[in-house]
Amino acid sequence: MANDIDELIGIPFPNHSSEVLCSLNEQRHAGLLCDVLLVVQEQEYRTHRSVLAACSKYFKKLFTAGSLASQPYVYEIDFVQPEALAAILEFAYTSTLTITASNVKHILNAARMLEIQCIVNVCLEIMEPGGSVGEEDDKEEEDEDDDDEDEDDEEEEEEEEEEEEDDPEDFADQENLPDPQDITCPQSPSKTDHLTEKDYSDTPRDFPDSFQPGSPGHLGVIRDFSIESLLRENLYPKANIPDRRPSLSPFAPEFFPHLWPGGFGAFAQLPEQPMDSGPLDLVIKNRKIKEEDKEELAPPPPPPFSSDFFKDMFPDLPGGPLGPIKAENDYGAYLNFLSATHLGSLFPPWPLVEERKLKPKASQQCPICHKVIMGAGKLPRHMRTHTGEKPYMCSICEVRFTRQDKLKIHMRKHTGERPYLCIHCNAKFVHNYDLKNHMRIHTGVRPYQCEFCYKSFTRSDHLHRHIKRQSCRMARPRRGRKPAAWRAASLLFGPGGPSADKAAFVMPPALGDVGGHLGGTAVCLPGPSPAKHFLASPKGTLSLQELERQFEETQMKLFGRAQLEAERNAGGLLALALAENVAATRPYFPLPDPWAAGLAGLPGLTGLNHVASMSEANN
């Protein structure tokens, strides 16, 4: 029976819920199928009971208290403002809350009375000290503009460069997230002062000790994202580190006094700088994030290279100057001691550039694909890849996108905007990676190389296409030309080539000592038949002038072929000129001409010897 039952196939429609809400909103504006009328200060609002009950616990209790027949059609509400109720109704049908700085308190009071918790949370977050409506809108836009994962190789490089600039904003969003447990209770205003844009630009941001404690409006310690700062805030995995000072004190009196040179004085005394022990203030891009941790933190340790640092670690050291190094072995042992691996957990970390660049980011795991998403607020965008939801629609062609930055790039097709400009030829591009590929034309950089034939390409898709063809891994037959001796011998035959009844021409033994590539007493070459040879004359007689003319034509053919070959190989007149200069030292005939030797004994043909030895370059 189980085999007879077909498997159920679920086909999701991600846009169905939004389309239903849009249809209900159109019915509300048109007054169709509305089953309740809300009256607030003589203003009427026609709506649907089911939508109100789904959004508000107050309306759910009101509409489900009795039977449907006994419930009235008109409800008059006197505890909310008309603007607040209109904004809440718009939120119920469009999932968008439109507020201003003037009516945020009225909307908060109405949401509390109607028991709409999500609106209460948003209004409380906006009304916190240091926040405003404009900053909330900017934060939402920045969250949408941050790229989370790569769709291809080129976009990955572009998004990594953008994340280098936008990472502090992600951390700011993480710190600004409200606690769900404490969201309902009103929070007390912060006691810390607010930074203006001018104060922030004039404030050093690298190290905590760069503040002047006596200056007015002191803001305490600015977080430098070092490991020491993270350990104090429990944001970095803390290892079992023993106490530093007692563990190093036994080594000091026995090891260090005799290792230092006598002329090296003690470290200069630095005055202690009193630090405020208030909560840490995080200032990022003209934004001050309120710390949720109310505990007062201890002041940071003094600078690592101060004399107080060594005094605290080595209390038993004498106050006088240190003695000289006694032997080279002591100096080597001293270096080995300082480079020991176990001291890595004892000495405090130095403020290196790599540690200052360490930026903690919130991480969330996808419940579907179990992928870890780095950055606060990026998990909902990742979930759209599974649900297929595309909330951002183009107003011109109605194409939908999952991310707002993709919609902005798509809108450039309609507006014609090309923000990326080439500095060499003023060419404009829509995408950043298109500009990078274009710049390689000017720079000549080919970063993508084939591992089989070592051919380089400017774009990665060109390399993938080359590898997919597998043209560099196939053994193809050699298509080169025949050797020069074979080409020279082929000119001795007619246009149709040698006939089937070709004879063999034997080189006389006297030519074996002539310079060339052949050695031996006799060499057998394919010879033409008497009827097809160019020396054969139909008249039976041949003059010396005609032989010289035909031989010069043969030399011109050789020169023409060599010229074409040089142009094809070198690809220019300069290479051809160089080839002529090289060819002057080497004749084109590596073999002696057998016909000159064969005709040397004929009467009246003695003047042909100097013509036969003439090379192509001399011609």
Curated annotation (Swiss-Prot):
Gene Ontology biological process terms, A to Z: negative regulation of cell population proliferation; positive regulation of fat cell differentiation; positive regulation of transcription by RNA polymerase II
Q: Where are stretches of biased composition, namely Acidic residues?
A: 134-173
InterPro entries, per database record: ARM-type_fold, BTB/POZ_dom, SKP1/BTB/POZ_sf, Znf_C2H2_sf, Znf_C2H2_type, ZnFinger_BTB_dom_contain
Q: Which PROSITE patterns match?
A: BTB, ZINC_FINGER_C2H2_1, ZINC_FINGER_C2H2_2
Pfam families per UniProt: BTB (PF00651), zf-C2H2 (PF00096)
Keyword vocabulary terms for this entry: Metal-binding, Repeat, Tumor suppressor, Zinc, Zinc-finger
Region: Disordered, residue numbers: 129-219
Instruction: List the signal peptide residues.
Output: none
Q: Which GO terms describe its molecular function?
A: zinc ion binding
Give every BTB domain span.
Answer: 34-101
SMART domains per UniProt? BTB, ZnF_C2H2
GO cellular component terms, semicolon-separated: nucleus
Q: Which residue stretches does the UniProt record annotate as biased composition, category Basic and acidic residues? A: 191-208
Record flagged with keyword Nucleotidyltransferase: no
Entry keyword annotation includes Metal-binding? yes
Q: Which stretches does the record call C2H2-type zinc fingers?
A: 364-386, 392-414, 420-442, 448-478
**Function comment:** May be a tumor suppressor gene.
Q: What is this protein called?
A: Zinc finger and BTB domain-containing protein 7C
Query: Where is the organism placed in the taxonomic lineage, from the top?
Result: Eukaryota, Metazoa, Chordata, Craniata, Vertebrata
